[in-house]
């Protein structure tokens, strides 16, 4: 049984949950989840957790994402995308220069209102379910960040561009906000998620077309996941103690990367097996001082233990 992360490709049409169901069916395991919903009309990278890989998905939701989007100026729909009912169509008299200026004005932080039709929850219910029942919930704006925008192409009313954005950013809302800035509104008509963190569409796998063996072979093992987090190595004899839930004291550590108090740290044994994720109780720079004074204090607090054998 493999545990880890799969970089999946979601085609247009299926929901993110459909991708999860396909992996469950082909790998014959119920422990499958995804790390960030991708709209049915969109395609691209969807991070899938398999078995104990589901327990680290929260860290993938916090990664930057890159999207390619095509929007249609002057078209306004209920859902802010091409699948929604048309609310209004307007003329767009903006010049190409004005369109580009409006797009680039959103680079940086701004307060974005999530669309009424989205997978976001309100009092335990998905917004899109409430909206279909006629219950439109107006959520407060959320501060998001557009790190950069490039490859802007203007062809009449259809405008495409790429954007690198913070987690939780709705590209549909960004398109509508650009449209409103131009005085005509806009709707996303095509959307591709090209990357999540360092994971790109080129390395993604369409699980609907892949055989079970290929899916299993493409699972990234836990030991190679979350490589942006600091790493510590404990003495081999501490393995069982940690897997049984014991907190990590200084004498257990053999070596460590630099880390700050409050950071999440990956805990490995000397064989290279990922044992746990833990929260640092101190800055790593202070550990040598503790060791010099022979103070065997707790330095890491367990958050998740991975007993995969």
From Swiss-Prot:
GO terms for molecular function: RNA binding; tRNA pseudouridine(55) synthase activity. Gene3D superfamilies: Pseudouridine synthase, PUA domain. Residues 229-306 form the PUA domain. Its EC number is 5.4.99.25. Pfam families: PUA, TruB_C_2, TruB_N. SUPFAM superfamilies: Pseudouridine synthase, PUA domain-like. The keyword Magnesium does not apply. InterPro entries: PsdUridine_synth_cat_dom_sf, PsdUridine_synth_N, PUA, PUA-like_sf, PUA_sf, tRNA_psdUridine_synth_TruB, TruB_C. PANTHER family: PSEUDOURIDYLATE SYNTHASE TRUB1, TRNA-PSEUDOURIDINE SYNTHASE. GO terms for biological process: mRNA pseudouridine synthesis; tRNA pseudouridine synthesis. This is tRNA pseudouridine synthase B. It is an enzyme of class 5 (isomerase). Keywords: Isomerase, tRNA processing. It catalyses: uridine(55) in tRNA = pseudouridine(55) in tRNA. The gene is truB. Belongs to the pseudouridine synthase TruB family. Type 1 subfamily. Responsible for synthesis of pseudouridine from uracil-55 in the psi GC loop of transfer RNAs. The active site is at 39 (nucleophile).
């Amino acid at each position: 049984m493999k545990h880890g992360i799969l970089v999946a490709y979601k085609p247009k049409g299926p929901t993110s949950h459909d991708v999860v169901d396909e992996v469950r069916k082909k790998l014959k395991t119920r422990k499958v989840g995804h790390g960030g919903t991708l709209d049915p009309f969109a395609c691209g990278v969807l991070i899938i957790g398999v078995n104990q890989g589901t327990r680290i998905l929260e860290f993938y939701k916090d990664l930057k994402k890159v999207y390619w989007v095509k929007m249609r100026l002057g078209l306004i729909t209920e859902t802010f995308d091409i699948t929604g009912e048309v609310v209004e169509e307007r003329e767009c008299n903006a010049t190409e220069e004005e369109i580009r200026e409006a797009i680039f004005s959103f680079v940086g932080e701004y307060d974005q209102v999530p669309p009424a039709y989205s997978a976001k929850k309100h009092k335990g219910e998905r917004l899109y379910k409430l909206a279909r029942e006629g219950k439109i919930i107006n959520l407060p704006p959320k501060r998001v960040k557009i790190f950069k925008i490039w490859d802007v192409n203007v062809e009449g009313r259809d405008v495409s561009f790429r954007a690198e954005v913070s987690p939780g950013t709705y590209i549909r809302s960004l398109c509508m906000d650009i449209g409103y800035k131009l005085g005509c509104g806009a709707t996303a008509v095509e959307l591709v998620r090209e990357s999540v963190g360092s994971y790109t569409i080129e390395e993604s796998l369409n699980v609907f077309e892949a055989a079970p063996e290929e899916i299993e072979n493409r699972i990234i093992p836990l030991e190679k996941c979350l490589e942006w987090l600091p790493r510590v190595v404990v003495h081999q004899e501490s393995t069982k103690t940690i897997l049984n839930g014991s907190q990590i004291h200084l004498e257990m550590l053999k070596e460590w990367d630099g880390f700050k108090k409050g950071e999440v740290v990956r805990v490995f044994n000397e064989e290279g097996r990922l044992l746990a994720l833990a929260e640092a109780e101190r800055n790593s720079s202070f550990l040598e001082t503790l060791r010099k004074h022979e103070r065997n204090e707790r330095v890491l607090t367990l958050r998740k233990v991975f007993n995969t054998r």
